[in-house]
Swiss-Prot record:
Keywords: Amino-acid biosynthesis, Metal-binding, Methionine biosynthesis, Methyltransferase, Repeat, Transferase, Zinc. This is 5-methyltetrahydropteroyltriglutamate--homocysteine methyltransferase. Catalyzes the transfer of a methyl group from 5-methyltetrahydrofolate to homocysteine resulting in methionine formation. GO terms for molecular function: 5-methyltetrahydropteroyltriglutamate-homocysteine S-methyltransferase activity; zinc ion binding. HAMAP family: Meth_synth. It catalyses: 5-methyltetrahydropteroyltri-L-glutamate + L-homocysteine = tetrahydropteroyltri-L-glutamate + L-methionine. CDD domains: CIMS_C_terminal_like, CIMS_N_terminal_like. The gene is metE. The lineage of its organism: Bacteria, Pseudomonadati, Pseudomonadota, Gammaproteobacteria, Enterobacterales. Zn(2+) binds at H643, C645, E667, C728. It comes from Buchnera aphidicola subsp. Baizongia pistaciae (strain Bp).
Length: 756
């Protein structure tokens, strides 16, 4: 008998209830108890929804107040000293101080670093390790939630992040040492947790070790053997992998004293005959056959045919999602503004639970394809011929691309001289990354415009006033290169998608990016093209308000691709080129209108990197080409900027050089300029702006702090190529936080200029 399960469920709530409650708590508008009540309501609802849709094993432990990696740090008592508020008591406010640098109680401090969760747009809080790190069971959240779910009568499957993946994701702070040395210290905490779970008579524990998709050093493989031998005997462990194939680590996995393994069949290509022969017969095999990272309906007929024989060969088989459903919206039923034809192609979290149940029942009860799964899968096949999907003009334009379309006219050194003459910027030029605060009145005006409560002219007048205000503030601050503030944009990807052909949009398709930050990714359903200019009028208007240069602000092709739900019938390379051609037209329109600086943001470049080293060069090749296709049509005098944030840059630095952007701005402040260590050996040839303060924390940086970071940067980057800027856009900050932070940033730059 086949069972089904999910690896995790979205936390935020259908209407972002968790986000609302978090932000009210942070601003002291509700109590901790009220926040806890919202969390419990969401958990109870989500467990019940999965149960009603036929899910056998309900995941518990997937809920988090900010991030599940941070939750693991809390459980282990791994809290940086600066966040402890003078004692060892681990509380909810401790968690928020680690994540944000500030909480309703305790002193404000620097937040812990944040970076991307493998190859997704979800961010986790990076664990910090030191030689003096100590661990003890300190956070009962998962046990309390298990008790909640058991009391409600659910068949519970606890979800915990495995010890090796936890250590891999962390960073050593201070004196360098091998963080694997901490494994013996954290295993007793895992043993205690597993014993507590065992006492509750729970049959299976999902222990996530996604680093098994990587090509691990031998010492890490040995650490797996040691760790899981130590954890043997407590519970039936379902070793869970996702985001890729682990076939290269099968020998290691099969050595481990575990009772089952979960494999991602969506993102890892496995031969089922090989699986059956290789994996021990007594083990449970869980097959991730429903895509947890994308919103397309599953071809259940295909999966039925593929799994039918395999299901009869295995004594114990589960089917599940490829990964946690954290990465997809909750319910498709609310999306009434999408045409019925297009909507029939999609499947959100609740619909994916339906898919698992339909397929489970068909495999358990039938030897042939059932009518239920045939009807479910039919729209997948009709979509292939839909006129909505295909555009002949786009296909023809792709064929006309030549090698010259990927090249600037001259090398950077020549361009820099022309740009200096054209722009006349001071040394250590100051700028921001693009967005300014999206206040409640801006969000209301956008909502009213979409609902028809105000007309186009009223909305444009409103946005124009905010742009004017932003320009005035920047001029008062003395910033050198200005931005228009992006007040007309709801999201850096969604906005461009709304103005390109080939996209559709949801009303309630929210997914968590980090903490309370949620995004509503566009869905790429067809060939992409641009019908008319997107950002031109707003940038032109902003430039009329000042004699200083105003940057044209665009989101890059790779980021639009990766931060959308992408179609699966076409390669990412081709889709990215389609987007790049549309953006190339936008870039040339901006240049023709007199815009001297154009920023094309690519924060997702690193995110798209395949987990396997052997596959990375191919991805980086087409990703770089897509950026260059969008940016290389301009003349030498036009300065191209790009921005990247919250990722590990070192392993893509060669690709960043190949982008050939005149200026790159990057996140470095949360890691105390740690990234710049790389520049000791690697001489980045173009201009660079390492972020000098963390915009994801409400803390206002001091002039001295910013000067310290800039002095550090000067050790690695020639001052003539150094820019001064925040880490990222300022959309989520208040105007007071923004103004005073930028004021200190500009003052720091001016003080240092005088000393040079």
């Amino acid at each position: 008998m086949i069972n089904n399960h999910t690896l995790g469920f979205p936390r935020i709530g259908l209407f972002r209830e968790l986000k609302v409650a978090q932000e009210k708590y942070w601003s002291r508008k509700i109590s901790k108890e009220e926040l806890f009540s919202v969390g419990k309501t969401l958990r109870v609802r989500h467990w019940q929804q999965q149960k009603e849709l036929g899910i056998n094993y309900i995941p518990v432990g997937d809920f988090s107040w900010y991030d599940h990696v941070l939750g693991t740090s809390m459980l282990l008592g791994n809290i940086p000293k600066r966040h402890k508020n003078g004692n060892d008591l681990v509380t909810l406010d401790t968690l928020f101080r680690v994540a944000r640098g500030v909480a309703p109680t305790g002193a404000s401090v620097s937040a812990s670093e944040m970076t991307k969760w493998f190859n997704t747009n979800y961010h986790y809080i990076v664990p910090e390790f030191s030689i003096k790190s100590e661990f003890c069971f300190s956070w009962r959240q998962i046990l309390d939630e298990i008790d909640e779910a058991l009391l409600l009568g659910h068949q519970v499957k606890p979800v915990i992040l495995g010890p090796l993946t936890y250590l891999w994701l962390g960073k050593v702070k201070g004196k360098k040492f091998d963080r694997l040395n901490l494994l013996k210290e954290i295993l007793p905490v895992y043993k205690y947790l597993l014993s507590e779970i065992n006492d509750r008579n729970i049959s299976w524990v999902q222990i996530d070790e996604p680093i098994l998709t990587l090509e691990l050093p031998e010492k890490w493989k040995n650490a797996f053997r040691f760790a899981y031998q130590s954890l043997y005997g407590y519970n039936s462990l379902l070793l869970t992998t996702y985001f890729g194939s682990v076939q290269h680590n099968f020998s290691l996995i099969c050595e481990l004293p575990i009772q089952g393994v979960h494999l991602d069949l969506v993102h890892g290509k496995y031969d089922l005959v090989f699986l059956n022969s290789f994996i021990p017969e007594k083990w449970l095999i869980s097959l991730g056959i429903i895509n947890g990272k994308n919103i397309w309906k599953a071809d259940l007929v295909m999966w039925f045919k593929r799994l039918q024989l395999f299901s009869k060969l295995r004594h114990s088989l589960w089917i599940g999602t490829s990964c946690s459903l954290l990465h997809v919206p909750i319910d498709l039923k609310l999306e009434n503004k999408i045409s019925s034809e297009v909507r029939s192609w999609f499947s959100f979290a609740l619909q994916k639970c339906q898919e698992l149940t339909l397929l489970r029942d068909a495999l358990n009860n039938s030897n042939t394809v059932t009518e239920d799964i045939r009807v479910w899968s039919q729209p997948i096949h009709s979509r292939k011929k839909s006129a909505i999907v295909h555009n002949v003009d786009v296909k023809e334009r792709l064929k006309s691309i030549t090698s010259n379309d990927f090249k600037r006219n001259n090398v950077f050194s020549v361009r820099k001289q022309k740009q200096h003459k054209n722009l006349k910027l001071p040394i250590l030029p100051t700028t921001t990354i693009g967005s300014f605060p999206q206040t409640a009145d801006i969000r209301k005006a956008r909502f009213d415009f979409k609902k028809g409560n105000i007309n186009h002219d009223q909305y444009n007048t409103f946005i124009s006033k905010h742009i004017q205000n932003a320009i005035l503030k920047q001029e008062k601050l003395g910033i050198d290169v200005l931005v228009h503030g992006e007040f007309e944009r709801n999201d850096m990807v969604e906005y461009f998608g709304e103005h390109l052909n080939g996209f559709v949009f949801t009303e309630f398709g929210w997914v968590q990016s980090y903490g309370s930050r949620c995004v509503k990714p566009p869905i790429i359903i067809g060939d992409v093209s641009r019908s008319k200019p997107i950002s031109l009028d707003w940038i032109k208007y902003a430039q009329t308000l000042t004699s200083k240069p105003v940057k044209g602000m665009l989101t890059g092709p790779v980021t639009i691709l990766l931060w959308s739900f992408v179609r699966e019938d076409l390669s990412k390379k081709i889709i990215s080129r389609q987007i790049a051609l549309a953006l190339r037209d936008e870039v040339l329109d901006l240049e023709q209108s007199g815009v001297k600086i154009i920023q094309i943001d690519e924060p997702a470049l690193r995110e798209g990197l395949p987990l396997r080293l052997s596959l990375r060069n191919e991805y980086l090749s087409w990703a770089v080409d897509s950026f260059k296709l969008s940016s290389s049509g301009v003349c030498d005098e036009t300065q191209i900027h790009t921005h990247m944030c919250y990722c590990e840059f070192n392993d893509i630095m060669n690709a960043i050089v190949l982008l050939d952007a005149d200026v790159i701005t990057i996140e470095t402040s949360r890691s105390d300029m740690e990234l710049l260590e790389f520049f000791k050996e690697f001489k980045y040839p173009n201009d660079i702006g390492p972020g000098v303060y963390d915009i994801h924390s409400p803390n206002i940086p001091s002039i001295e702090w910013i000067m310290t970071l800039l002095r550090q940067a000067m050790h690695y980057i020639p001052v003539k190529r150094l820019w001064v800027n925040p880490d990222c856009g300022l959309k989520t900050r208040t105007w007071d936080e923004t103004y005073y932070s930028l004021e200190n940033m500009v003052r720091a730059a001016k003080i240092l200029r005088k000393k040079l």
